[in-house]
Design a protein with these regions (language model features):
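Structural signature of the Rossmann-like NAD(P)-dependent dehydrogenase/reductase core
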Residues: 11-12, 96-97, 142-149
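A short, exposed helix-loop element centered on a Lys and neighboring polar residues
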Residues: 129-130
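Catalytic loop of short-chain dehydrogenase/reductase
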Residues: 137, 145-157
Length: 157
């Protein structure tokens, strides 16, 4: 694997979990990491914020940029992408990591929850790709990585 030294990653949902792990791995190579997530304020039920993630990225050897961003909102995505480009000069890799999951069956899924999953998992990933693509096309080796929420490990079809 080649180094991510000097590359810029725009990672959604990077304040915790898999997104944070990807950010820290990239930081160890010296990458610039834009942490785009809704978690600007600490939540006692969920670890991490965009600010703690940016600090961890810096401690790991990269440059971190904390961006409060709800990826369902086009204006917020566009502003976060613009801030990333203004700060780091471009975007090399988009990691669509943010997701909404609901590990219940169809009959137990309220439409409000279904709509949230579609808005985050589909619309949000599309919005981020659409906003990042003009900048990715200027990068020498651009990538878009889209992760999916984990499927139930005990399916009942």
């Amino acid at each position: 694997m080649s180094s991510l030294q000097g590359k810029t990653l725009f990672i959604t949902g990077a304040s915790r979990g898999i997104g944070l792990a990807i950010a820290l791995r990239a930081a160890r190579d010296g990458a610039n990491v834009a942490i785009a997530a809704k978690s600007a304020v600490a939540n006692p039920k969920l670890p991490g914020t965009i600010h703690t993630a940016a600090e961890a990225v810096k401690a790991a050897g990269g440059q971190g940029l904390a961006l409060k961003c709800d990826i369902r909102e086009e204006d917020q995505v566009n502003a976060a992408v613009a801030a990333t480009v203004d700060t780091f000069g471009g975007i090399d890799i988009l990691v669509n990591n943010a997701s909404a999951i609901w590990l219940r069956g169809t009959l137990d899924t309220p439409m409000k929850r279904f709509d949230l999953m579609q808005q985050v998992n589909s619309r949000g990933s599309f919005l981020c790709a659409q906003a990042c693509l003009p900048h990715l096309l200027q990068a020498p080796n651009p990538h878009i990585l889209t992760l999916a929420p984990p499927p139930s490990l005990d399916p009942k079809w």
